[in-house]
């Protein structure tokens, strides 16, 4: 009997990459590769990569060095790299990494089965061409998994904002929206398999449908998804603050299934830095959107992204960022030290902030956010929250779930409750999660 072939798939970076990895796994299952958690047992290793920051890119190259030894022990193993590093480097990756077999870009996932078949015959190939056609976003097997209660659904890909620091437009391409009929069909299929929560994904979901003649708007898409039986919660990410309209804000008050959480990246609280970043809004405009959002939905939980040490950022600029964080009261912030990215406008900016200063500012920012997060989590103690139970917690004998506001809750529960939304009394607020008890 022939042994089934094994796939080890490692994902770096954002939720879009997580979604892409799910597609990769489904495609490769179609040609006989099944997942393993042990890379040493794999016949095929795929790294789905991120290049949004230099540190993420360095991590990929470090992993490729580690796989050189595995390739030596198992010469027949196939090693592939996809995602944003692959899109950025293309043929150079094959030239610089002799033990690499396949390079495929962000627009070429659907070609992966034939690339693997070619690699099985000893060929080394790179496919990184952009395909400006929405049909490529639907060239994937139907998701037939019955595990998990929460899924990602890609609604669009690409970005045309060209923030001065950001490589995404260069590695994900121009904005392309999927057909709404295909999106709704995918969500209906997921609902039929027991999925209760979907997260609609795009680099800038606000732009959904704007370039597609006759296609519905993102707001209309949200409303259509909310009508699908079985889907009890809807999330979306990411929104660009300059496009965050009042009609979209109103959806948080008008669509009961839309979760009370929004990820709205500010990147900085300084108008001078925001202008240099080409963000397209001011501090005042951002805070105005936050105020309107809180007025429409007082229970909204807000997360964001912050970059520290952008070229020319002064101590005064940094203090403006800290004061913005205090005013918004983010429940979490993803914060990063600025790093130059190839092809971006900011890569040519002078007035670099020193590395020690960057690190010091990041530490101060993290200290502030930890305080705000802990205060926020403690404020939930004594309240009853609706929690979607997702699975077993790493804490022995407990399960975990999320509130509508995206706070993780650990609690004693029964496996029969996985996939159910239950009322939970919050008994403790910790730094990274909440502790609760089922309301009987």
Swiss-Prot record:
The Radical SAM core domain is annotated at 145-375
- List positions binding [4Fe-4S] cluster 2: 159, 163, 166
This protein's UniProt keywords? 4Fe-4S, Cytoplasm, Iron, Iron-sulfur, Metal-binding, S-adenosyl-L-methionine, Transferase, tRNA processing
Q: Which cofactors, if any, are listed as required?
A: [4Fe-4S] cluster
Domain annotation TRAM: ranges: 378-440
Q: What is its main location?
A: cytoplasm
Ranges in a coiled coil: none
Residue ranges spanning the membrane: these are: none
Molecular-function annotations in GO: 4 iron, 4 sulfur cluster binding; metal ion binding; N6-isopentenyladenosine methylthiotransferase activity
Which subcellular locations apply to this protein?
Cytoplasm
Name one cellular component (GO) term: cytosol
Q: Enumerate the PROSITE patterns for this protein.
A: MTTASE_N, MTTASE_RADICAL, RADICAL_SAM, TRAM
Residue ranges of every copy of the MTTase N-terminal domain listed in the record:
5-121
What residues bind [4Fe-4S] cluster 1, as annotated? 14, 50, 84
Q: Catalytic activity annotated for this protein?
A: N(6)-dimethylallyladenosine(37) in tRNA + (sulfur carrier)-SH + AH2 + 2 S-adenosyl-L-methionine = 2-methylsulfanyl-N(6)-dimethylallyladenosine(37) in tRNA + (sulfur carrier)-H + 5'-deoxyadenosine + L-methionine + A + S-adenosyl-L-homocysteine + 2 H(+)
**Details of cofactor binding:** Binds 2 [4Fe-4S] clusters. One cluster is coordinated with 3 cysteines and an exchangeable S-adenosyl-L-methionine.
| CDD domains reported for this sequence | Radical_SAM (cd01335)
Q: What is its EC number?
A: 2.8.4.3
| EC main group | transferase
**SMART domains from the entry?**
Elp3 (SM00729)
**InterPro entries registered for this protein in UniProt:** Elp3/MiaA/NifB-like_rSAM, Methylthiotransferase, Methylthiotransferase_CS, Methylthiotransferase_N, Methylthiotransferase_N_sf, MiaB_methiolase, rSAM, rSAM_horseshoe
What's this chain's function? Answer: Catalyzes the methylthiolation of N6-(dimethylallyl)adenosine (i(6)A), leading to the formation of 2-methylthio-N6-(dimethylallyl)adenosine (ms(2)i(6)A) at position 37 in tRNAs that read codons beginning with uridine.
How it assembles, according to the record, is: Monomer.
Q: Which family does it belong to?
A: Belongs to the methylthiotransferase family. MiaB subfamily.
Q: What is this protein called?
A: tRNA-2-methylthio-N(6)-dimethylallyladenosine synthase
Q: Which gene encodes it?
A: miaB
């Amino acid at each position: 009997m022939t042994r089934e072939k094994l796939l080890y798939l490692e994902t770096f970076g954002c939720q879009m990459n997580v979604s892409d990895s799910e597609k990769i796994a489904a495609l490769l299952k179609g040609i006989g590769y099944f997942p393993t958690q042990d890379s040493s047992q794999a016949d095929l290793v795929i790294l789905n990569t991120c290049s949004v920051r230099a540190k993420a890119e360095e991590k990929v190259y470090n992993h490729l060095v580690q796989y050189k030894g595995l390739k030596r022990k198992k010469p027949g193993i196939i090693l592939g790299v996809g995602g944003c590093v692959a899109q950025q480097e293309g043929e150079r990756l094959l030239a610089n990494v002799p033990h690499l077999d396949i390079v495929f870009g962000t627009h070429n996932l659907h070609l992966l089965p034939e690339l693997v078949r070619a690699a099985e015959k000893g060929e080394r190939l790179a496919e990184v061409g952009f395909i400006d056609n929405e049909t490529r976003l639907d060239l994937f097997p139907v998701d037939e998994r019955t595990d998990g209660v929460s899924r990602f659904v890609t609604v669009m890909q690409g970005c045309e904002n060209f923030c001065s620091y950001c490589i995404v437009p260069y590695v994900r391409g121009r904005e392309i929206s999927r057909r709404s009929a295909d999106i709704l069909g995918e969500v209906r299929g997921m609902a039929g398999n027991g999925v209760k929560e979907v997260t609609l994904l795009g680099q800038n979901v606000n732009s959904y449908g704007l370039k597609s003649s006759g296609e519905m708007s993102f707001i209309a898409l949200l409303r259509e998804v909310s009508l699908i039986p079985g889907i009890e919660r809807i999330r979306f990410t990411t929104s660009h603050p300059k496009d965050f309209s009042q009609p979209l804000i109103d959806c948080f008050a008008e669509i009961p299934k839309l979760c009370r959480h929004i990820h709205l990246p500010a990147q900085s609280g300084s108008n001078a830095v925001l202008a240099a970043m080409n963000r397209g809004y001011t501090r005042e405009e951002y805070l105005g959107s936050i105020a309107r959002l809180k007025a429409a939905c007082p229970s909204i939980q807000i997360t964001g992204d912050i970059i520290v040490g952008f070229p020319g950022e002064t101590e005064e600029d940094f203090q403006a960022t800290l004061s913005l964080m205090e005013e918004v009261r983010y429940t979490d912030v993803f914060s990063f030290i600025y790093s130059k990215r190839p092809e971006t406008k900011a890569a040519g900016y002078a007035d670099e902030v020193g590395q020690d200063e960057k690190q010091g500012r990041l530490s101060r920012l993290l200290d502030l956010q930890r305080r705000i997060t802990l205060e926020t989590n403690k404020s939930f103690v004594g309240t009853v929250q609706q929690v979607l139970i997702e699975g077993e917690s790493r804490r022995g004998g407990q399960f975990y779930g999320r509130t509508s506001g995206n706070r993780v809750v650990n609690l004693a529960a029964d496996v029969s409750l996985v996939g159910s939304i239950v009322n939970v009394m919050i008994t403790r607020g910790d730094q990274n999660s909440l502790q609760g008890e089922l309301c009987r």
